[in-house]
Amino acid sequence: GILLRDPESGLEVLLQYGVLEELDIITRSVKVVNRTMGKVVLLKAASMCLDWLSGDYEWLTFYGKHAMERTLQRTPIAHGISAIGSVRGASSHHYNPFAVVCEKDTNETKGLCYGVSFVYSGEFLMETEKDQIDQTRLICGIHPDDFAWTLEPGESFDTPEVILSCSSEGFGKLSHN
């Protein structure tokens, strides 16, 4: 992992990675450790953040309802912030904690695409943002609306894992990873 430490407070954040080479996936989570002398309250806990420095992307998300689960929604990533999530206490077929960021011409057999699956059955938030110089960011984690976790000195908090995969051969290859 990669350890980040605030030299003033002593708060530590460990970016944890797992590599499952035979499955062509990477896992990512975050551990926050309170090495301070007092309580720390976490108000947001993202498991991952991905940045693309250039490119024109779309993202695929899935929503659903009774007898129509996993309805595909393909949306251009425009300037500003776009989000999917759930504040119902659980993830579900209404909004699935899975997304694909892809180039505009990506299809089943060609094109670059990145899959992100949040391994969590609670409230979640996935956000994309395209900034003023056309960089794209994707953040995924626990939904912050009802989240507040107190860490006493010495205590830690682990975010749920995110599973990441990539394909330069379209959605078909990505779905087999």
Q: Which residues does each predicted region cover?
A:
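Generic detection of long, well-ordered alpha-helical segments
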Residues: 20, 39, 153, 168-172
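Short Pro-Gly-centered flexible turn/kink motifs
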Residues: 149-168
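Polysaccharide-binding surfaces and accessory modules of carbohydrate-active proteins
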Residues: 1-131, 135, 145-147
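Acidic/glycine-rich phosphate/pyrophosphate-binding loops and surrounding catalytic core
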Residues: 118-122, 163-177
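Glycine-rich phosphate/adenylate-binding loop
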Residues: 138
